[in-house]
Amino acid sequence: MSTAMKSKLHFRYSMVILPIFVIISHIILGFPLGIFGQTNTDATYQFVTKWGSLGEGDGQFDGQNDVDFYDGKVFVADYANHRVQIFDPYGKFIAKFGEGGESDGQFHKASALSMDSEGNLYIADQFNFRIQKFTNDGTFITKWGSEGAGDGQFLHPHVPANDAEGKLFVTDRDLANVQVFTDDGEFIMKWGSEGEGDGQLSNPESSIVDSQGNVYVADYGNDRIQKFTNDGKFVTKWGDKGTADGQFQGPSGLSIDANDNIYVTDKNNNRIQVFTSDGQFITKFGEPGSGDGQLIDPEGVGVDKESGAVYVADTGNNRIQLFEYQL
């Protein structure tokens, strides 16, 4: 990302007096000011720009389900167009790859994606019942998975997540579990079963991994977030059904920032909620509608860890929206 882009994302804040350590942390470490030490409850994320509409052309979407950010580029899983599209941070189209089909590099509903630390891209190829791995320019590397309930098989693979050791965590809505693989698809273990108890899941949508290796799962059907160790031991949970702060109606997408704060797309409440890694509510943004900053059935969310910019897959509006934190 260029210096000009970083400056635009970093410094469009109100004129306030801040402790010097917060300013230093923001300038040197790249932490968003509001999340690092902000106590102003009126501060939140504000709309910056948007792009996309319903269609098949470059920059158009049909049910885009997920979004991620890596090395100055925005990657979007364009679900019903069976492809991935790549943009610059402000929505200028760069490239695309994929088409409908069953061959290597083809998709039958590209439902979700994630990036590893080396820039490789993992796509949940939903109705081909597999994960496909690509370079970040769309070159096919490998694939794994088939239809079924056995180890390494899928019925409804959803958002994969990567840890610092190269392991990949894949949620499966219909199997109500999380499967763990090496970065080339070798099955390691799995955990989870259908239910409402601690460690049980109901239609899990996505997962994310923090800097300590803990795994967070959007437990969609139970309207909560669950936190696990990376070998599947239950740590904590938060949320229940409702519209208040910290409650959910269909938590779907997850992302994480440089401070291990967790971003959740609260799909049927048409908003994004932000929490600490132990589930303490920080802020929220979004409301129902099609105007700037409004959302309809948002699914995916991605955070640029350097600038703190937040990208939301505003699925019902067939667009991506960019937000930044402002005081």
Where are these regions (language model features)?
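Signal peptide processing junction and immediate N-terminal pro/mature segment
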Residues: 28-38
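N-terminal secretory signal peptides that target proteins for export/translocation
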Residues: 1-11
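Bacterial N-terminal signal peptides
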Residues: 17-30
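Eukaryotic scaffold repeat domains enriched in small/polar residues
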Residues: 36-327
